[in-house]
Amino acid sequence: MPKKVDHDNQYKSNKALLKTSTFDLTSTKHYDWVITIVFYCAVHLIEMELDGCKNYDSIDHYDRKLQILSTKSLRPISKIYLALYIESMRARYKCENITRDDAEKALRTLVSIEKAVC
């Protein structure tokens, strides 16, 4: 079971990837991957919080959603996390057109989650 430090390291690694030229919004067309990376940044932030609050590690996305809804410190971000989850599913599995605006919105959502959790 990963610990808080493991999730923190993965969050930082994912966040660093977003800062590379490959995923710079001014030049990339890989908006689907930007959203995917943003989503997994959020996942690891939430897992850090769950480990810190409950010594708990989610087993899957559904379990994490239930934990978010039942954890007082995470409940305020439940709606934006769920919206980011849906957007990541759209980017990963639906093969829909993902735009720069979609990626920018995902990045703003991550900032909100960072403020709530960090």
Give residue spans per PLM region.
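Terminal alpha-helical segments
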Residues: 1-118
